[in-house]
Amino acid sequence: MIRQKAPYRYASKTRLSIRRTDSGSAGCYVTVAVRGNQEFIIAELDSEIRKIRLKLTDSYEEGVKLSSGTFTLPARFCREILPDDVRSITILLEKSVDDWWYGSY
């Protein structure tokens, strides 16, 4: 995945960037504030209220591999978040008391 630079208005924000790859999957990037020292990340969608939540974990059984803030999710995830004519999106994230990061898309 090619890391893309976020628009200036998001430069200092805690965020998740999602980009549709050539294969249709979702190439994702989270900022340093989100990723911490864990090696895996869990991503969940609630399509009814259009929210995403992320949580870091040390368990490979629960999450996908996180490498320097980048990770890949299946194409169905990308189709849910990105309309057909949109290649990428930036979602601002906020940490909740339950240790999950939440954002709206």
Predicted regions and their residues:
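Short beta-strand-centered segments at strand-helix junctions
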Residues: 22-37, 67-84
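Secondary-structure transition/turn motif
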Residues: 31-34, 54-64, 104-105
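Detector for the mature cores of small, proteolytically processed
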Residues: 65, 69-70, 80-89, 96, ...
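A short, polar/proline- and glycine-enriched secondary-structure boundary/capping micro-motif
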Residues: 40, 61-68
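A short beta-strand-loop micro-motif that forms or neighbors metal/cofactor-
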Residues: 2-22, 35-58, 84-99
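Compositionally biased, intrinsically disordered low-complexity regions enriched in proline and serine
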Residues: 9-11, 30, 61, 78, ...
